[in-house]
From Swiss-Prot:
Highest classification ranks of the organism: Eukaryota, Metazoa, Chordata, Craniata, Vertebrata
Native species: Mus musculus
Official protein name in the record: V-type proton ATPase subunit d 2
Keyword Ion transport (UniProt): yes
GO cellular component, one term: early endosome
Family note: Belongs to the V-ATPase V0D/AC39 subunit family.
Matching InterPro entries: ATPase_csu/dsu_sf, ATPase_V0-cplx_csu/dsu, ATPase_V0-cplx_dsu, V-type_ATPase_csu/dsu, V-type_ATPase_csu/dsu_dom_3
Gene designation: Atp6v0d2
Any one GO MF annotation of this record: proton-transporting ATPase activity, rotational mechanism
Superkingdom in the source lineage: Eukaryota
Gene3D superfamilies, A to Z: ATP synthase (C/AC39) subunit, domain 3, V-type ATP synthase subunit C domain
Function: Subunit of the V0 complex of vacuolar(H+)-ATPase (V-ATPase), a multisubunit enzyme composed of a peripheral complex (V1) that hydrolyzes ATP and a membrane integral complex (V0) that translocates protons. V-ATPase is responsible for acidifying and maintaining the pH of intracellular compartments and in some cell types, is targeted to the plasma membrane, where it is responsible for acidifying the extracellular environment. May play a role in coupling of proton transport and ATP hydrolysis. Regulator of osteoclast fusion and bone formation.
Length: 350
């Protein structure tokens, strides 16, 4: 017997949940990947993708076909699907989907700011921006010289505005400060998204909170790894860590003091969920920390579909689709560069 909350969920969101589950069922199978890695050219790859849910998404692309064109068209296809979900959603699912776009908006802003710093044309950089993170005021990013300028001129009317409260400063936006800004924005964003899911409760909280806890900890670990050998002080490093993960508070305090990968690994070894991930780094497969994080993310997102009546399936589907796209780009790059020895080093999903 369905509980009242579940009945209301079906009334408001049941159609879209059914739709996204159908989309998940159309992800590439292991047999599809076996066929893709046997392709000799990008044209062969295109022909095989036409037999999958991707269909004729490359029909309008002129020769020569490039990896970049394939990647761009896959992103556009995902964006069209997501826009359909968002355009037909009711609250609070609409807000949840808006939260999902914020990470792409942050990446786009940072991309545009770095482009302005390197004197690249806005048009050139806009072409590289993720379609899920596009917003009207993006082109004005190049006029901002400080975070305060950026907020006043560009972001005040966007969903990112609340995350800027901890980032306001008059520091010139050089390469280091832009990267610090990215991490501060992500920290505020993840903590706000986590609070939204936790406050929502029900199955959405059960599914999304562990996923966002993992994402917060992954960011803390990657920030730590990338800060070794840089000017970033240990105190500043700690201010960039999201506090909604399992590492909070003691693990984050220890990570802030870590001076090399081995010390970082010792911190992770204290947490049952992260020890096996670090143990898997290197070894016969030559996996990187990023590889094992992606594998863990895929596992969590696949499991999200085992539960019903929650918003997490929308998040999980987009993340799984992105991993599928990374896999296709990896295979396409190996084919394009005739570097087939590592063509099977993609991350399986189903």
């Amino acid at each position: 017997m369905l509980e009242t909350a579940e009945l209301y969920f079906n009334v408001d969101h049941g159609y879209l949940e059914g739709l996204v589950r159908g989309c998940k069922a159309s992800l590439l199978t292991q047999q599809d990947y076996v066929n893709l890695v046997q392709c000799e050219t990008l044209e062969d790859l295109k022909i095989h993708l036409q037999t999958t849910d991707y269909g004729n998404f490359l029909a309008n692309e002129t020769n020569p076909l490039t990896v970049s064109k394939i990647d761009t068209e896959m992103r556009k296809k995902l964006c069209r699907e997501f826009d359909y979900f968002r355009n037909h959603s009711l609250e609070p699912l609409s807000t949840f989907l808006t939260y999902m776009t914020c990470s792409y908006m942050i990446d786009n802003i940072i991309l545009l700011m770095n482009g302005a710093l390197q004197k690249k044309s806005v048009k050139e950089v806009l072409a590289k921006c993720h379609p899920l993170g596009r917003f009207t005021e993006m082109e004005a990013v190049n006029i901002a010289e400080t975070p305060s300028d950026l907020f006043k001129a560009v972001l005040v009317e966007t969903p990112l505005a609340p995350f800027f409260q901890d980032c306001m400063s008059e520091n010139t936006l050089d390469e280091l400060n832009i990267e610090l800004l990215r991490n501060k924005l992500y920290k505020s964003y993840l903590e706000a998204f986590y609070k939204f899911c936790k406050d929502h409760g029900d199955v959405t909280a059960d599914v999304m909170c562990p996923i966002l806890e993992f994402e917060a900890d992954r960011r803390a670990l990657i920030i730590t790894l990338n800060s070794f050998g840089t000017e970033l002080s240990k105190e500043d490093r700690e201010t960039l860590f999201p506090t909604c993960g399992r590492l909070y508070p003691e693990g984050l305090r220890l990570l802030a003091q870590a001076e090399d990968f081995e010390q970082m690994k010792r911190v992770a070894d204290n947490y049952g969920v992260y020890k096996p991930l670090f143990d898997a780094v290197g070894g016969s497969g030559g996996k990187t920390l990023e590889d094992v994080f992606y594998e863990r993310e895929v596992q969590m997102n696949v499991l999200a579909f085992n539960r019903q009546f929650h918003y997490g399936v929308f998040y999980a589907y987009v993340k799984l689709k992105e991993q599928e796209m990374r896999n296709i780009v990896w295979i396409a790059e190996c084919i394009s560069q005739r570097h087939r020895t590592k063509i099977n080093s993609y991350i399986p999903i189903l």
